[in-house]
Amino acid sequence: IWVQPAAGDAGGSLGAALAFWHQELNNKRETNPNDSMKGSYLGPRLKNTTIEKELSSLGANFQKKTEEELISVLAGALSKEKTVGWFQGRMEFGPRALGARSILADPRSEKMQKELNLKVKFRESFRPFAPSVLIEDVDGWFDLKYPSPYMLLVADIKKDMQITMTSDQEKLFGIDKLNIARSKIPAVTHVDYSARIQTVHQETNLRYYKLIKKFKEI
């Protein structure tokens, strides 16, 4: 089963484009058993010159780095519990940030979920975040047997990655109980030990794949 990642009203624009392509322009329809959206990166891509001009107009301090340098610096920052604004390539189409316009942080940090919610997203501290994991590593962390490139599937965290609450912690109530670390990746673990997962594939988002791989090595 393949689920359209933008299955709401916004996805109707894709259907309208396809209807025009096939019905008005008389192009033959070909069904594809694979994922033809290839990551759903259908939005605009900004040129470096455009980005530099905008940063300069804001008086922002910035540096130009090679891709290898950029990935190394950002992976190091993430490992030190820094928050990264990740902006690269074409923008995602649909409801989820999938490694093109994303806020990134270390899922192992016990404080990161609260800090991102309160200081960056300006919302309730207990709201969950979702993990991006290399497709070849997903089985080591989650009970998930299928690719989930669009962050649509929820699966339990592996038992050996979970942290069982103590009897005293079980007695806690409300936000105090929600703040208890439930796994080795507490920033992306739901209260029921599940997570909403994005599998990352080098075929569809190579730069994001490289960043996560570098972070893994650190």
Task: Kindly label every feature range from the protein language model.
Residues 2-218:
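Flexible beta->alpha loop and helix N-cap segments adjacent to enzyme active/binding sites
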